[in-house]
């Protein structure tokens, strides 16, 4: 089962660190289940110290069953342009203001969960809103489990007027 849960991450900033530290710390994922791509050597060093594979090539993260998009919304277009034409796995986006429609249009991804964690995730006391309505039951369960590792989770339905 662990091999099916391989998680690729693009973006190794604060929220990615909090989420992955929680998932590893709670035993939801092992460090060997994860690969993180980040252009910053310091970020890669942080993850390598956790035992996580860390690379600078975003394409390596696409080889996983799940992809956590943890980049700043303003840099998403650069990442999407770089990966245009690639096959995307199930996407979990923590980018504020980027709709599933926009992510799909930019990447071609067909299965996307939008997630909005908050800063207390870094100490395991977060509250995360999850819209996993595009995912099947197993993938939705994975997303919920991932964010339960860093706090409480509330499932939300997609509403056009809500911009997570």
Locate each region found by the language model.
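NAD(P)+-binding Rossmann beta1-loop-alpha1 motif at the extreme N-terminus of oxidoreductases
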Residues: 1-56, 125
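Short alpha-helical
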Residues: 14, 41-42, 74-75, 98, ...
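Phosphate- and divalent-cation-binding pockets in alpha/beta enzyme and binding domains
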Residues: 18, 46, 78-79, 102, ...
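Predominant activation on well-ordered alpha-helical scaffold segments within soluble catalytic domains
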Residues: 20-21, 77, 104, 144
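Rossmann-like NAD(P)(H) cofactor-binding subdomain of soluble oxidoreductases
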Residues: 35, 41, 50, 59-128
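Short acidic-hydrophobic, aromatic-tinged amphipathic segments that line or gate anion-handling sites
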Residues: 53-59, 154-156
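Internal alpha-helical scaffold of NAD(P)-dependent oxidoreductase catalytic cores
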Residues: 102-111, 127-164
